[in-house]
């Protein structure tokens, strides 16, 4: 009886939590990489820039994988005038030096990229999320890491404004002309993998209130895509997303803007494609979401004609060179 119960528990955990993230990265990587002699992006002017771009790592991991590296590099290259801030919970605070990892070494080559520690208690301070975060500390929930990420991104947008991107995006175009915008994933749901909002926008305040008032950490997406969809429907007084694309200063962009390939078709990123088709395929796309939850661990040859390999080569060439050397 015990053996069977233990086996079932393990299988449930495996199904809910998923396989280890790095199952596809079993090779040994060097801790440092020499910066390439490429024309570097123009460093941004000092002082607070209104268009900061934020990436988040809410786990304690400090070794960005190649897709993470490509996300940040592609954002840095398309936004040379912006600060690209990579906030990682596992980084030490104070004046401690950064951990020695290939990803951190490579991303440090870009003058507009900063790797900074993420202090969640400080981020949530003076927001409706502070009490929720204190309460959730002592309990186990199946989706706590993604839920922490959901909370962190809306707190960042509320407190600082700018652009938030998940670490499984490849950025194709400059995003600075987008303000108070989020992307539509499908006919029925919005997605917060990309957010662009002004600081202290009322929509983000409503998101934080809904996060706490209707909290349920046991349903996948309830605090993320479903939350944004709920709040947008209330914001616009609509029942269906089809009724309105924009209202009261907040705009939703169609799926091709950020989610041109639906999550159900994630394997298309690993299929060969004619390079001449790329511009047509993504003519209406700002950034490509790769659905890492589905695709993680899927291997591809960096030099192949796979769609993902071609996107790496074009939009994050420094990461792509590292992949060719070490994959």
From Swiss-Prot:
InterPro entries: A1-4-GlycosylTfrase_dom (IPR007652), Glycosyltransf_32 (IPR051981), GlycoTrfase_DXD_sugar-bd_CS (IPR007577), Nucleotide-diphossugar_trans (IPR029044)
Pfam family, one: Gb3_synth
Catalytic reactions on record: a beta-D-Gal-(1->4)-beta-D-Glc-(1<->1)-Cer(d18:1(4E)) + UDP-alpha-D-galactose = a globoside Gb3Cer (d18:1(4E)) + UDP + H(+); a beta-D-Gal-(1<->1')-ceramide + UDP-alpha-D-galactose = alpha-D-Gal-(1->4)-beta-D-Gal-(1<->1')-Cer + UDP + H(+)
Gene3D superfamilies hit by this protein: 3.90.550.20
Keywords annotated in UniProt: Glycosyltransferase, Golgi apparatus, Lipid biosynthesis, Lipid metabolism, Membrane, Transferase
Protein name (Swiss-Prot/TrEMBL): Lactosylceramide 4-alpha-galactosyltransferase
Protein function: Catalyzes the transfer of galactose from UDP-alpha-D-galactose to lactosylceramide/beta-D-galactosyl-(1->4)-beta-D-glucosyl-(1<->1)-ceramide(d18:1(4E)) to produce globotriaosylceramide/globoside Gb3Cer (d18:1(4E)). Also able to transfer galactose to galactosylceramide/beta-D-Gal-(1<->1')-Cer. Globoside Gb3Cer is a glycosphingolipid of the globo serie, one of the major types of neutral root structures of glycosphingolipids, that constitute a significant portion of mammalian cell membranes.
GO cellular component terms attached to this protein's record: Golgi membrane
PANTHER family: LACTOSYLCERAMIDE 4-ALPHA-GALACTOSYLTRANSFERASE (PTHR12042:SF17), LACTOSYLCERAMIDE 4-ALPHA-GALACTOSYLTRANSFERASE ALPHA- 1,4-GALACTOSYLTRANSFERASE (PTHR12042)
EC number(s) stated in the UniProt entry for this protein: 2.4.1.228
Superkingdom of source: Eukaryota
Pathway(s) annotated for this protein in UniProt: Glycolipid biosynthesis
Family that this chain belongs to: Belongs to the glycosyltransferase 32 family.
Membrane topology: Single-pass type II membrane protein
Gene: A4GALT
Localization, UniProt: Golgi apparatus membrane
Naturally occurring in which organism (per UniProt): Gorilla gorilla gorilla
Principal subcellular localisation of the protein: Golgi
Comment, domains: The conserved DXD motif is involved in enzyme activity.
Claim: Transferase is one of the keywords in the record: yes
Record GO terms (molecular function): galactosyltransferase activity; lactosylceramide 4-alpha-galactosyltransferase activity
